[in-house]
Amino acid sequence: QKRCYFIKDWDQLLVNMALSGPDLQIYSAEIGVGHFSDFSVTPTCGMATSTSFVGQLDQPRYFIHPGSRQARIVWFTTGYLEYILPNFIPDHSVIEELTVSFEISSEAPRFCDVWPSDITFSLNGVILGTWTSPGDYGDRRGKYNPSWWFSFLNQYGLLKKLTITPEGTFLDAKKLSDVSTGQL
């Protein structure tokens, strides 16, 4: 099995932070998949915008290409992408819940619908948990894929929701770990 960290195949990250109490407020931010602040990736790897690949495929050096900011899909075999998320929460507030929504899958050469890959999620250096992605999907064309996207490449991922609450960390409402908002 491969070990990857936090991302593979997202158009954007949708982050919601909810405060508790009578003044409940929700702060949201949409972060493009190409807006990572640090990375370490190994081939097979690459990025693409809605109109073309960013640089050359399987060349990690293109992850610093200026066009990476417009990426709509990112993939790599092993490694990580790190994001700096905006924090609009007022000082001395208590975060009740943090939710991150994304599309994700494994990364296999070309694609392989059965390709288990461990993906570890972390926040502020704290490991939230590991989930095993079942595959890298190419059995049908992706709903939003551009016409130029090759049919022999990954076509879509799974829509996932990572939620951190006072009770722990959950992926699609299934407990991933005991790491809570209070520990972050």
Q: What is the predicted role of each segment?
A:
Residues 1, 13, 78, 134, ...:
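Enriched - but not universal
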Residues 1, 12, 25, 56-59, ...:
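Residue-identity detector for glutamine
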Residues 15, 95-98, 159:
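Generic hydrophobic, helix-prone segments enriched in Leu/Val/Ile
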Residues 23-146:
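Mid-protein regulatory/catalytic core that forms ligand/cofactor-binding pockets
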Residues 2, 18-29, 33, 154-156:
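Short N-terminal segments
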Residues 1-18:
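Basic, Lys/Arg-rich alpha-helical nucleic-acid-recognition elements, primarily the DNA-binding modules
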Residues 141-184:
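Short, surface-exposed tryptophan/glycine-enriched loops
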